């Protein structure tokens, strides 16, 4: 007989067969499977042995059994745990576990960090030899703690006795421990018990909260020591000690969360008991006392997720793991969340319950006092219960006795009978509970047997083949009067009323839950709380810095007075000055490094004085006055001496620059006056020669000092003697020139020191003191001849005079940082020159690599090498280094270009003054005239900041070529001179565009100082507002920036000035008050170290290198940088073409898109949208100018062929693409009048009324339209104007074609880009031309009902085969069990009988449910499934905070605040308007009402059910009996009380809504279409269609109060609000027909006067709180339906989780391309959106069977024709095909069915044929709210 292979496979796949086969083969020696299994076992064993070797071994030393050791190894698998069993003690297992826990927690902490061990065993820690530093806080809070301390000291003594050698580290610890103990004990004896008195290094006697021990970067741990520490106190202590992370453990049993009063701790062999708010822990077989702790404090560690310390620090509390009965937890500093804007958080915790195989079993006892049954529950093994049930189920009724069941349960308590043999079971039930278990089982079995008999009886009667008369009569009787007698019903009702539990309700077996849920929500407030440097108030920090500086200055002044005696004549500080008192004004830090003049004047800082006074190996020379005549010579000698002896290292010395400046000015005046009065008194020729020879000798000796030390020393002495003699007979002015020469020479030596070379003797002297005379370099650093020295002396007085009278601010641009403010400086310092730049063949690249400083030498150099970015870890560091490298490359490139221009000049390349020079260069010749003579021509503009000075030798070779800081004088009219002030240092001067500003040089050197500072650990958050041109970026800054706290940086100077003007106008302040509004260059050049700001507003940030943005953020200490920019306009441009930048683009953390422009006309907005350059949808504008762009090309009537074809317009702004075109156009137009010509790049960010863009060249360039980089330039060029733009181009490029195409665009399309209120109006469009072009396409009248039926059957197969006509009858006549709570039923009410009602017979067969009848079962079923099935919110909600935040957002986002009307709502006029809308019946009922207000029960409602069930659009009708909708409505008089006010409020709300926020107040499809007219179908949206379940019934107090607060904005007074809230809280509903009364908490009542409005705004407010609706382009709300459209690029989080956890809404988010709102699809039809009703609902309703006559059929026909009129347009049907396929997940094409449907719904005869009606149409009027 053949064997079926499928049966064999079925047998083989069984688990038992497989196990048996493997077992048989594996145990057979020699088989292949046996060998494989043995090899696998061997490998597994060897792997386990190897893993055990690498684990850390811990000897717990306690006397533990092998089972306990194995349990410890199982609980802590990362450790190899053994025991030497050398110690016995109390609860050994717990002690061993505590030791392992300590080791685990310590292993998670950095080894070199300090650790606070709360309640830790310091005796154990002190004996550690692992280098850890642990401080234990061990307070004595009870006698046991004191005993512990004594035992620990005994263990220390034992350790000392047993150890022959003690490691030095441990020995030092024990010594310190003993010293601290002696001190603590002495303090306690003296009754000193303050925290400071009990403090020690390794342990203290304080609580952790009071511990005064401090350690940097510390951690904390707590091993079973937090039970009695309040969680808040612990957090405060952690914050005070600046602890970021704490770990700990504590005993825990999940039974505590389940509410049990006692339980076991199985792994610890212990137990717990809860008593009077405390939990007691104890251990079995342990004589030691247990522990008692505060249960409430312990529960906080279990339930809390966050805890906020008093200083504002937020600690995140996490239960990391549970090992046995020990719970591990951590507290981590999470304050940064608040900085990132987190204001609320909720967490879900669940603790597993290890009782998966147990059952909750009920047992009963009789109370001896009350003789009542007492119910309790126990946990029993699932196997035990199942075996017991199986046994009792097999017993016959006579055998079902307590004896038999007791015997069985006792004999099989821990054994299982298998095949006649017993097998021991691990679990055993408490024998004392056997009798109670037996009782429950017997009663439960008897109950089940009775139910089985009843089922069998009824089933046998029903299953008979033959039907007799008695059976039918009996069945009829039961159908009519019910199967349950009235007597039994009454008794059951009475039992429910007295809470008498009976039947199966009394005995239920339930499974144990898998986990216990713990929830917690903590509010994170934004209140300022300074804490550990995380939340830093910059203003407070500035105040503290100023106080510190004032204190330091006072210390310095006092130090001057103290050491003046030591210095003797070195100090010039008067006694009166020492006693001066500082005034109370703010101190300005004006310190700078000490120079020569400071030492001579006695301005010596404290740190230098301390070192100086302590030294004895220096010169102690004296002088008669502050300015010694031999001072400079003595400095040189001192330098020689210091060079020969070991060097002295002095700390940096700072002086007050302000005081030094005042003294310097006074001395300059004195020198000038002295020079003038003695102008006729001079040296003789011989004396001058002798003096010059001495100075020349001095300079020569200094130059060769290092090579000839001994010779130089003697030479210096001789030179000093010579100068000393000359000083006696010569004027101070001459000596000053010598000093100046020495200073210049000395400065070169100082530069050499900066390059990193060996220090020279001159710098040694300079480290001690500097000259008091202002250094003025008037010649080359190599000047040494007597003639040049004499020339220098003659020029000195002139230079002093010119500089003293000059008002131009100058600054030293070559020193690293100018110490004194440039605003206060009146003396100019000529740039320093480095020795590294003397050699012509040495490039700046090599110099940069050694010194990181750019020299002043101008020469041709190679670009520096690219930095090694791999050294830097973060993107910000790489960008900053690249920015520095870029600046250096720019400087080197510019200098190379300048040097090339000079070389070309010397080579005779330039010879004609009429021809322009490169870079608008100009040469000044100082060899003929001291004022200089222009060689070729003047520059186009004066005022250059720098020039290039160079001198030539006799062979016309360059001897020196350096950058020079220029000064420009002004005439009496304030106009700048055409020539700069002669520096008299060079023969020629080059001026060029490259040297006009040269900000890069100063910025680079300042940023070098910034780089030296410590890198920030937390980078600023970069936010970009990516806006189209003219979107109001500067206006946004004006409205959001705080000019007193924030920093506003702009790339361009014009933008900065514009912002300053706006701020001055807004804040009524002067420009001097706006120092925080700067250009980026100005900030980095002058004030880079003077300001701090938490928020930086960076205008046009994308035009700057990313590294510059990061530098500004770091310098200011910013937390947030808000960048304004346009991602599509001209970005940062690399001006050094030979290098490639990798990190120039800014890394954005958050981007906000702005696509509304206020500048550009309508055609420009359409042009930008058409080009699709901007993501995020259509670009719209507020500028109503329709057409603004024109073009003139080479083939026009007046062709554009040259620059002379461009017309002149006085007020127009001319733009070109390149600088060369700019120059050509300027030259062509300047003769016609004043003209403004700029490049496109220069005008980015600017606005003009009329713009003329000019392209002169026909050759290609990458920035021209159509070029590789042309897009940004096209955008900027076309978006600068408000009124007009004309593009003159010599070639028909892409911009020419685009503008030409724009002239052909229809006006109606252009108008879609105009953003105004009227374009978004809900009740009509301003531009009627849109409707003219929107013509519908006629639908042919074809098709039959068969096509419709076929489509329906294919989409919803099986629905048409179900006949649900008798479903209501079966439900009403069959037994049904409905459990209801808070509900009563009056059995004396008449019971209705189901009636067979039929109407017209439809042609289509659909799942349209029949009309239900108002029967008790239907009413209770609807109550159960609707009102009683509402979800219950489990989370704790701070309602008032949520409501306040949400309503405030609603006021800003939903409404136009100017239209909000908050006047009185209940007026005579509003009441009359409401009265007129009421029906005649309602008015008659109200007129009969006689109750007064105080007699009304506002909490009483009527209850009924709707007869019509909502049709289901799925296949659920095939297996589900749907519940009817319920209606809960108050009396008419109550609606009359609230109705007028609610109606008025809803009208006010509708009128105050913003255009893009729509309140669907019963709108039809045409009205809905008007609300979406402004939306562009070409724009993609991210649509949110949310379906709420049980919406009305899910309402809580949060919804009710939120809507009330919203209504208060529109005039709802407090009395109405109170009454309305009262009527919605606890309510009683009653069904008079069926005698049902129920009680509801909250819920939206579906029949009150504001059901629709309350539903609408409940949903709207919930969605507003859960989603960023401020970013939505369109939103519409109506009842529980909503549709929200966001720009496509936005990523919006699914709101359903928050809606469920906070707003109690069960919902789901639909992700459809074709969205639906209120049963209508939103379709893209033509050039607009339109709403169209869902045809599937109509097809389903066409199967309705309860249409009774032709009148109702006519009414339905009228209603359908009105609502589905859009079906006449074939375009609608075409889009519906896609929507239906997507919505109903079908591949069927619905086109034919839709066409046939349209044919039958607009012709009454065809419509009537669908219901087999042959009558005529009945004239009727249908209300818009008609439903069928």
From Swiss-Prot:
Gene Ontology MF term list: ATP binding; ATP hydrolysis activity; mRNA methyltransferase activity; RNA binding; RNA helicase activity; RNA-directed RNA polymerase activity
Tell me which residues make up the RdRp catalytic domain.
1581-1694
Q: What Pfam families does this protein map onto?
A: RdRP_2, Viral_helicase1, Vmethyltransf, Vmethyltransf_C
Residues annotated as domain (+)RNA virus helicase C-terminal = 1155-1320
Q: Which residues does the annotated region (Helicase) include?
A: 1026-1289
**Which reaction is the catalytic activity of this chain?**
RNA(n) + a ribonucleoside 5'-triphosphate = RNA(n+1) + diphosphate; ATP + H2O = ADP + phosphate + H(+)
Output the GO biological process annotations, alphabetical, semicolon-separated: DNA-templated transcription; methylation; mRNA modification; RNA processing; viral RNA genome replication
Coiled-coil residue windows: 701-728, 1432-1496
Q: What is its EC number?
A: 2.1.1.-, 2.7.7.-, 2.7.7.48, 3.6.4.13
Q: Where is the Alphavirus-like MT domain?
A: 82-302
The (+)RNA virus helicase ATP-binding domain extends over: 996-1154
Q: Tell me the segments the record calls region Methyltransferase.
A: 61-812
Q: Does the keyword DNA repair apply?
A: no
Q: Keywords on this record?
A: ATP-binding, Coiled coil, Helicase, Hydrolase, Methyltransferase, Nucleotide-binding, Nucleotidyltransferase, RNA-binding, RNA-directed RNA polymerase, Transferase, Viral RNA replication
Q: What else is known?
A: The replicase large subunit is translated as a fusion protein by episodic readthrough of a termination codon. When readthrough of the terminator codon TGA occurs between the codons for 1320-Lys and 1322-Arg, this results in the addition of the RdRp region.
Oligomeric form and interacting partners: Heterodimer of a large and a small subunit.
The family annotation for this protein states: Belongs to the ssRNA positive-strand viruses RNA-directed RNA polymerase family.
This protein is called Replicase large subunit
């Amino acid at each position: 007989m053949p064997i079926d292979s499928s049966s064999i496979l079925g047998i083989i796949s069984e688990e038992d067969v497989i196990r048996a086969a493997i077992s048989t083969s594996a145990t057979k020696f020699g088989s292949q499977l046996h060998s494989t299994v043995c090899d696998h076992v061997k490998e597994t064993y060897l792997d386990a042995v190897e893993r055990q070797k690498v684990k850390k071994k811990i000897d717990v030393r306690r006397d533990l059994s092998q089972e306990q050791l194995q349990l410890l190894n199982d609980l802590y698998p990362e450790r190899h745990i053994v025991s030497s069993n050398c110690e016995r003690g109390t609860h050994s297992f717990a002690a061993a576990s505590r030791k392992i826990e300590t080791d685990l927690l310590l292993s998670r902490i950095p080894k070199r960090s300090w650790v606070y061990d709360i309640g830790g065993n310091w005796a154990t820690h002190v004996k550690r030899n692992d280098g850890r530093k642990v401080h234990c806080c061990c307070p004595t809070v009870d006698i046991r703690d004191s005993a512990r301390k004594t035992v620990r000291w005994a263990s220390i003594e034992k350790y000392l006795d047993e150890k022959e050698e003690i490691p030095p580290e441990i020995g030092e610890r024990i010594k310190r421990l003993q010293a601290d103990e002696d001190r603590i004990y002495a303090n306690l004896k003296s009754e000193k018990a303050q925290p400071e008195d009990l403090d020690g290094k390794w342990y203290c006697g304080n609580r952790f909260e009071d511990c005064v021990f401090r350690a940097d970067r510390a951690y904390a741990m707590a091993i079973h020591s937090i039970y009695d520490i309040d969680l808040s106190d612990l957090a405060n202590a952690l914050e005070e000690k600046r602890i970021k992370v704490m770990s700990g453990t504590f005993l825990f049993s999940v039974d505590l969360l389940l509410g049990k009063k006692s339980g076991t701790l199985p792994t610890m062999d212990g137990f717990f008991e809860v008593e009077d708010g405390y939990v007691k822990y104890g251990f079995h077989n342990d004589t030691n006392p247990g522990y008692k702790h505060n249960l409430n404090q312990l529960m906080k560690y279990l339930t809390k997720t966050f805890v906020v310390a008093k200083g504002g620090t937020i600690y995140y509390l996490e239960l990391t793991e549970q090992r046995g009965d020990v719970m591990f937890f951590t507290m981590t500093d999470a304050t940064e969340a608040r900085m990132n804007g987190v204001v609320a958080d909720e967490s879900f915790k669940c603790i597993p319950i290890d009782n998966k195989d147990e059952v909750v079993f009920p047992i009963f006892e009789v109370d001896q006092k009350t003789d009542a049954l007492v119910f309790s529950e126990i946990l029993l093994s699932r196997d035990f219960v199942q075996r017991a049930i199986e046994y009792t189920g097999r017993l016959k009724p006579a055998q079902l006795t307590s004896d038999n069941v007791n015997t069985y349960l006792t004999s099989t308590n821990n054994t299982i009978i298998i095949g006649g043999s017993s097998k021991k079971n691990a679990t055993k039930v408490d024998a004392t509970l056997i009798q109670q278990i037996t009782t429950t089982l017997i009663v439960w079995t008897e109950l089940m047997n009775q139910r089985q008999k009843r089922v069998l009886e009824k089933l046998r009667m029903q299953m008979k083949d033959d039907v007799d008369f008695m059976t039918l009569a009996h069945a009829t009787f039961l159908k009519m009067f019910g199967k349950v007698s009235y007597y039994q019903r009454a008794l059951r009702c009475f039992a429910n009323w007295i809470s008498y539990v009976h039947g199966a309700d009394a005995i239920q077996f339930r499974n144990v839950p898998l986990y216990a849920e713990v929830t917690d929500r903590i509010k994170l407030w934004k209140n300022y709380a300074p804490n550990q440097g995380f939340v830093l108030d910059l203003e407070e920090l500035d105040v503290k810095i100023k106080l510190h500086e004032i204190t330091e200055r006072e210390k310095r002044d006092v130090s001057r007075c103290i050491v003046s005696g030591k210095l003797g004549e070195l100090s010039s500080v008067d006694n009166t000055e020492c006693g001066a008192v500082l005034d109370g004004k703010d101190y300005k830090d004006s310190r700078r490094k000490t120079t020569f003049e400071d030492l001579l004047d006695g301005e010596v800082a404290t740190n230098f004085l301390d070192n100086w006074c302590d030294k004895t190996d220096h010169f102690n020379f004296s002088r008669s006055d502050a300015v010694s005549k031999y001072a400079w010579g003595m400095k040189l000698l001192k330098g020689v001496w210091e060079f020969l002896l070991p060097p002295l290292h002095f700390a940096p010395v700072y002086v007050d620059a302000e005081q030094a400046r005042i003294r310097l000015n006074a001395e300059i005046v004195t020198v000038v006056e002295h020079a003038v009065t003695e102008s006729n008194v001079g040296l003789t020729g011989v004396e001058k020669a002798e003096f010059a020879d001495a100075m020349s000798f001095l300079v020569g000796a200094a130059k060769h000092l290092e090579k000839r030390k001994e010779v130089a020393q003697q030479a210096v002495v001789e030179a000093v003697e010579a100068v000393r003699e000359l000083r006696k007979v010569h004027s101070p002015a001459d000596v000053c020139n010598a000093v100046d020469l020495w200073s210049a020479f000395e400065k070169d030596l100082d530069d050499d020191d900066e390059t990193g070379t060996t220090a020279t003797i001159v710098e040694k002297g300079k480290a001690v003191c500097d000259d008091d005379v202002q250094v003025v370099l008037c010649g080359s650093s190599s000047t040494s001849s007597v003639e040049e020295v004499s020339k220098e002396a003659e020029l000195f007085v002139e230079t002093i005079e010119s500089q003293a009278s000059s008002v131009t601010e100058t600054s030293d641009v070559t020193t690293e940082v100018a110490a004194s403010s440039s605003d206060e400086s009146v003396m100019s310092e000529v740039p320093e020159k480095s020795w590294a730049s003397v050699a012509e063949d040495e490039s700046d690249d090599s110099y940069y690599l050694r010194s990181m400083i750019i020299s002043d030498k101008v020469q041709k150099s190679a670009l520096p090498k690219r930095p090694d970015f791999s050294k830097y870890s973060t993107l910000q560091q790489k960008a900053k280094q690249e920015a520095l490298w870029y600046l250096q490359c720019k400087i080197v490139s510019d200098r190379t270009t300048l040097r090339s221009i000079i070389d070309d000049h010397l080579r005779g390349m330039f010879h004609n003054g009429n021809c322009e020079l490169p870079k608008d260069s100009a040469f000044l010749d100082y060899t003929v005239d001291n004022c200089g003579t222009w060689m070729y021509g003047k520059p186009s503009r004066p005022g250059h900041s720098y020039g290039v000075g160079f001198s030539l030798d006799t062979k016309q070779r360059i001897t020196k070529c350096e950058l020079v800081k220029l000064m420009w004088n002004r005439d009496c009219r304030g106009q700048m001179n055409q020539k700069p002030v002669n520096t008299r240092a060079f023969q020629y001067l080059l001026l060029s565009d490259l040297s006009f500003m040269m900000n890069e040089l100063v910025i680079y050197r300042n940023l070098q100082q910034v780089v030296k500072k410590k890198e920030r650990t937390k980078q600023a958050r970069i936010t970009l507002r990516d806006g189209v041109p003219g979107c109001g970026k500067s206006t946004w800054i004006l409205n959001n920036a705080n000019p007193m706290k924030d920093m506003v940086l702009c790339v361009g100077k014009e933008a900065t000035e514009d912002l300053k003007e706006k701020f001055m106008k807004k804040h009524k302040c002067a420009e001097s008050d706006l120092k925080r509004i700067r250009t980026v260059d100005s900030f980095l050049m002058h004030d880079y170290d003077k300001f701090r700001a938490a928020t930086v507003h960076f205008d046009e940030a994308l035009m700057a290198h990313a590294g510059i943005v990061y530098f500004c953020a770091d310098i200011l200490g910013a937390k947030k940088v808000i960048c304004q920019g346009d991602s599509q306009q001209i970005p940062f441009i690399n001006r050094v073409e030979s290098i490639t930048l990798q990190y120039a683009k800014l890394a954005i953390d958050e981007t906000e898109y702005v696509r509304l422009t206020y500048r550009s006309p309508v055609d420009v907005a359409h042009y930008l949208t058409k080009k699709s350059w901007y993501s995020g949808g259509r670009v719209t504008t507020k500028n109503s100018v329709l057409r603004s762009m024109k073009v003139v090309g080479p083939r026009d009537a007046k062709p554009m062929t040259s620059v002379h074809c461009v017309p002149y317009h006085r007020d127009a702004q001319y733009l070109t693409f390149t600088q060369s075109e700019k120059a050509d156009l300027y030259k062509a137009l300047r003769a016609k009048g004043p003209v403004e010509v700029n490049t496109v790049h220069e005008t980015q960010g600017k606005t003009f009324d009329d713009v003329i863009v000019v392209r002169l060249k026909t050759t290609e360039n990458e920035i021209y339209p159509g070029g590789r980089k042309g897009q940004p330039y096209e955008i900027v060029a076309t978006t600068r104007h408000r009124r007009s733009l004309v593009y003159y181009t010599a070639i028909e490029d892409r911009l020419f074609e685009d503008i030409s195409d724009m002239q052909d665009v229809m006006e109606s399309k252009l108008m879609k880009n105009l953003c105004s209120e009227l374009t978004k109006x809900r009740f009509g469009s301003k531009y009627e031309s849109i409707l003219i072009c929107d013509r519908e396409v006629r639908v042919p009248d074809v098709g039959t009902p068969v096509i419709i039926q076929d489509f329906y059957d294919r989409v919803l197969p099986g629905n048409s085969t179900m006949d649900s006509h008798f479903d209501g009858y079966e439900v009403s006549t069959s037994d049904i069990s409905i459990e209801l709570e808070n509900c009563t039923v009056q059995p004396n009410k008449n019971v209705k009988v189901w009636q067979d009602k039929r109407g017209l017979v439809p042609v289509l067969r659909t799942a349209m449910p029949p009309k239900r009848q108002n029967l008790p079962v239907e009413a209770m079923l609807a109550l159960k499934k609707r009102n009683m099935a509402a979800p219950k919110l489990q989370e704790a909600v701070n309602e008032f905070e949520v409501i306040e935040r949400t309503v405030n957002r609603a006021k800003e986002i939903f409404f136009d605040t100017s239209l909000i009307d908050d006047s009185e709502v209940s007026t005579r006029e509003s009441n009359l308007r409401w009265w007129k809308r009421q029906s005649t019946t309602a008015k008659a009922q109200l007129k009969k009402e006689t109750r007064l207000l105080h007699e009304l029960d506002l909490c009483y409602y009527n209850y009924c059910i709707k007869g019509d069930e909502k049709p289901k659009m799925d296949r659920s009708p095939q297996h589900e009996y749907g519940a009817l909708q319920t209606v809960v409505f108050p009396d008419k008089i109550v609606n009359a009380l609230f109705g007028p006010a609610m109606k008025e409020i809803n009208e006010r709300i509708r009128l105050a809504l913003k255009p893009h926020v729509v309140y669907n107040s019963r709108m039809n499809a045409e009205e809905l279409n008007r609300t979406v007219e402004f939306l562009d179908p070409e724009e993609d949206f991210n649509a949110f269609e949310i379906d709420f379940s049980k919406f009305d019934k899910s309402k809580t107090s949060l919804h009710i109060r939120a809507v009330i607060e919203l209504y208060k904005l529109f005039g709802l007074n407090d009395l109405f609000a109170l009454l309305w809230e009262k009527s919605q809280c606890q309510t009683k509903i009653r069904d008079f027909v069926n005698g049902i009364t129920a009680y509801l908490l909250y819920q939206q009542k579906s029949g009150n006067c504001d059901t629709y409005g309350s539903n609408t705004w409940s949903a709207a407010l919930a969605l507003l709180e859960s989603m960023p609706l401020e970013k939505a382009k369109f939103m519409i709300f109506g009842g529980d339906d909503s549709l929200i459209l966001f720009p496509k690029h936005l990523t919006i989080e699914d709101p359903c989780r928050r809606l469920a956890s906070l707003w109690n809404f069960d919902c789901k988010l639909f992700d459809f391309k074709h969205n639906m709102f209120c049963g209508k699809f939103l379709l893209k039809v033509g050039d607009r959106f339109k709403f169209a009703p869902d045809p599937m609902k109509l097809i389903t309703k066409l199967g309705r069977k309860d249409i009774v006559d032709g009148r109702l059929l006519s009414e339905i026909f009228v209603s359908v024709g009105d609502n589905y009129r859009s079906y006449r347009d074939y375009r609608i049907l075409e889009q519906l095909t896609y929507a239906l396929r997507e919505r109903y997940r079908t591949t069927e094409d619905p086109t034919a069915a839709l066409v046939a449907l349209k044919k039958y719904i607009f012709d009454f005869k065809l419509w009537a044929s669908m219901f087999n009606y042959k009558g005529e149409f009945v004239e009727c009027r249908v209300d818009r709210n008609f439903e069928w």
